[in-house]
Amino acid sequence: MTINPVSRKVAWLRVVTLAIAAFIFNTTEFVPVGLLSDIAESFHMQTAQVGIMLTIYAWVVAVMSLPFMLLTSQMERRKLLICLFVLFIASHVLSFLAWNFTVLVISRIGIAFAHAIFWSITASLAIRLAPAGKRAQALSLIATGTALAMVLGLPIGRVVGQYFGWRTTFFAIGMGALITLLCLIKLLPKLPSEHSGSLKSLPLLFRRPALMSLYVLTVVVVTAHYTAYSYIEPFVQNVAGLSANFATVLLLILGGAGIIGSLVFGKLGNRHASSLVSIAIALLVVCLLLLLPAADSEAHLAILSIFWGIAIMVIGLGMQVKVLALAPDATDVAMALFSGIFNIGIGAGALVGNQVSLHWSMSAIGYIGDIPACAALVWAVLIFRKWPVTLEEQPH
């Protein structure tokens, strides 16, 4: 399919709007991390009980990414985006109105359905809409929108929730999505589906050991991170005994450090992606190990969060870039699988953190998260040695 020639300005506006959409979708996934205590208080529940919402959301995305991608594979992309945004916005209105925890979970499942479709098509859409010769920059913009969700979206959502209530945070995200939808309707041309892949491309991807090994690494390292990260807000208040305001500051520091991580990866990622990811996983191991000892002071936790934020950003960007490089002939299927696998890790980590907090002690989330982190480090070293050229340069 050939899109009618458009000015570079319009082409970039389309990509930027998609990047804003990526920011909004990732913000709504992560923002409950900063609102757990407030949601728990409003429904008279324990924080760890509310935390199961994180696992449900992530696993719905994980399970539904590939089926939804296949079900919508022939659907015109502009129409598909409009439909999933309508579902996304309506579900946020329901989150705002939620009269009990069950209704809130149902609303989050609706958002997760929209999320599952969005992330399976976004990378390939960005490539199609990009100005000539600017595909890499377009993907970088989408990655930046994703990264900013943790850098700005989560902390801002936490601040809004702290001062105006958690319901207002969800309502604001819904309104942001509505504005973005109106921009997409105005800017996007009709986009017939192409290169979306099908079940036929799955065996092809499964026969790529470098890609499969990367998927395994993704789920293990994401599980490690989210075991601790999912409960960092109640950890700061209940274990470290620090204020709710400092919990907000810490989330800002952790997210802001992601900017440093993205700059580092942008500078060195093309040449040294494998080494950077391995070093970042090693840094994650150290951060999780030191989480409880660092809880003795605000300064120690702040310093640790800087390195933690850098590490997880480098890991996330590295994985995404490698998956796209290893599956250029089936980007939608590969990214749907990646999104699903990433969310299996989020859900698993949140569930482990939930169980540790409920049945043992929230103070142990760093130590427990360190177990899969160490396994991820060993696996990373092994696979990057076995497929150094494949992972760095080749699509097969």
From Swiss-Prot:
Keywords: Cell inner membrane, Cell membrane, Membrane, Sugar transport, Transmembrane, Transmembrane helix, Transport. It is a multi-pass membrane protein. The chain crosses the membrane at residues 15-35, 50-70, 81-101, 103-123, 136-156, 169-189, 209-229, 246-266, 275-295, 301-321, 333-353, 364-384. Disulfide bonds: none annotated. One of its GO terms (cellular component) is plasma membrane. It is found in: Cell inner membrane. InterPro entries: MFS (IPR011701), MFS_dom (IPR020846), MFS_Efflux_Transporters (IPR050189), MFS_trans_sf (IPR036259), Sugar_effux_transptr_put (IPR023495). One of its GO terms (molecular function) is carbohydrate transmembrane transporter activity. Its main location: membrane. Pfam families: MFS_1. Belongs to the major facilitator superfamily. SotB (TC 2.A.1.2) family. HAMAP family: MFS_SotB. Involved in the efflux of sugars. The physiological role may be the reduction of the intracellular concentration of toxic sugars or sugar metabolites. This is Probable sugar efflux transporter. The gene is sotB.
